[in-house]
């Protein structure tokens, strides 16, 4: 019996991004001429009894003490929420902002808490693409562009 090898699809993924949202956010920052890095550094943090690393999705250098970090999220899993609370506790000066596909999604099937409400309760800035039809609020874009003038 003759065996056939499976051919690889000519449409294999060529993007370096983990999601379409990350790719589109990358294109948005590029179009706005905002300097940024994509998953280009790691932040060490401790989970109880375990050293871990966090790689931010996008980071925009600024002339401020810290860069602005953007986490793009379609789904906001419990593990992500726990991780970001630990990082916020260990690095309170980091400016981590969430960019959600839809911040009105609930954090769980039985929960009444939305992604937006969770961010408000935990002190994180966030933005909703779905409700604004924008990747970032104009104020954030201006803030970053102003802080990158001298870089």
Predicted regions and their residues:
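Catalytic cores of nucleic-acid endonucleases
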Residues: 74-126
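Conserved beta-strand termini and adjacent loop/short-helix elements that scaffold enzyme active sites
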Residues: 39-41, 99-101, 129-132
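Charged phosphate-binding loop/patch that engages nucleotide di/tri-phosphates or the phosphate backbone
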Residues: 1-4, 8, 13, 113-151
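Detector for Asparagine
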Residues: 26-27, 59, 63, 102-105, ...
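Conserved alpha-helical elements of sugar-nucleotide-dependent glycosyltransferases
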Residues: 17-24, 83, 111
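Active-site metal-binding core of divalent-cation-utilizing nuclease and nuclease-like domains
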Residues: 6-18, 28-66, 72-81, 88-89, ...
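A short acidic, often aromatic-flanked loop/helix-cap motif at beta-alpha or helix-coil junctions
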Residues: 44-46, 105-106, 131-138
């Amino acid at each position: 019996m003759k065996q056939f090898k499976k051919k690889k699809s000519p449409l294999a993924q060529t993007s370096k991004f983990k999601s379409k949202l990350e790719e589109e956010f990358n294109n948005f920052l590029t179009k706005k001429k905002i300097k940024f890095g994509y998953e280009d550094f790691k932040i060490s943090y401790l989970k109880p009894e375990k050293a871990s690393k966090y790689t931010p999705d996008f980071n925009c250098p600024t002339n401020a003490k810290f860069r602005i970090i953007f986490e793009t999220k379609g789904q906001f899993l419990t593990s992500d929420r726990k991780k970001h609370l630990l990082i916020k506790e260990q690095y309170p000066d980091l400016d981590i902002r969430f960019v959600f596909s839809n911040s009105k999604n609930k954090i769980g099937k039985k929960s009444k808490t939305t992604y937006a409400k969770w961010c408000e309760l935990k002190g994180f800035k966030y933005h909703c693409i779905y409700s604004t039809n924008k990747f970032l609020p104009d104020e954030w874009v201006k803030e970053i562009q102003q802080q990158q003038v001298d870089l």
